[in-house]
């Protein structure tokens, strides 16, 4: 907490007025990140015209968010200590809410027969794993000679959506 206080030019005492400890600070930072991801997905879900395109856009928005906010992404998805994960609070968390929006998008695709009958939970986790994987790789390996990040991202998301089609 002292290093954080130094970095933001506050006293450690000031930080403790808002957060009980480092785990609490990290939890709130992660919740804020999940809230932003959820807001992005909610906006995209408003367009009901093409559920596959909406699903695709949610995947692209996820990657875009991570690349534009790599430090938040690292703390939330890469460096976050697992011992702070509390299953009792998971169902109410912003992370669960953000994931449920992805699930809702997959359900819309299934219900409108845009993708084959599939376990929505499995498909949603597979889609999340794919976009998380490419986001994490691009953030943690910036010096790797990526051919063209945008083309790679689009190919991944398009492949995932095409692979689910009926």
Describe the residue ranges of each PLM region.
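Helix-turn-helix
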Residues: 1-24, 28
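Hydrophobic/aromatic-rich alpha-helical bundle segments in the mid-to-C-terminal region
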Residues: 74, 85-89, 110-157
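C-terminal alpha-helix
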Residues: 105, 159-163
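An amphipathic alpha-helix adjacent to DNA-recognition modules
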Residues: 18-42, 56, 60, 99
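Short helix-capping/turn signature of helix-turn-helix
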Residues: 19, 78-82, 129
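Short secondary-structure transition hinges
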Residues: 68-104, 143
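Hydrophobic alpha-helical connector segments
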Residues: 42-71, 124-127
């Amino acid at each position: 907490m002292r290093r954080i206080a130094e970095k933001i030019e506050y006293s450690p005492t000031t930080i403790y007025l808002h957060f009980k400890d480092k785990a609490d600070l990290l939890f709130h930072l992660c919740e804020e990140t999940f809230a932003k991801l959820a807001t992005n997905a909610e906006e995209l879900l408003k367009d009901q015209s093409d559920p596959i395109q909406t699903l695709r856009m949610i995947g692209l928005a996820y990657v875009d968010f991570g690349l534009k906010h790599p430090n938040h992404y690292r703390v939330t998805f890469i460096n976050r200590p697992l011992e702070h994960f509390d299953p009792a609070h998971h169902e109410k968390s912003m992370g669960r809410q953000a994931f449920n929006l992805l699930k809702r998008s997959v359900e819309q695709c299934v219900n409108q027969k845009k993708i084959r009958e599939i376990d929505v939970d499995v498909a949603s986790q597979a889609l999340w794993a794919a976009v998380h994987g490419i986001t994490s790789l691009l953030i943690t390996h910036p010096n790797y000679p990526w051919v063209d990040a945008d083309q790679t991202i689009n190919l991944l998301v398009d492949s995932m959506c095409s692979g689910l089609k009926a």
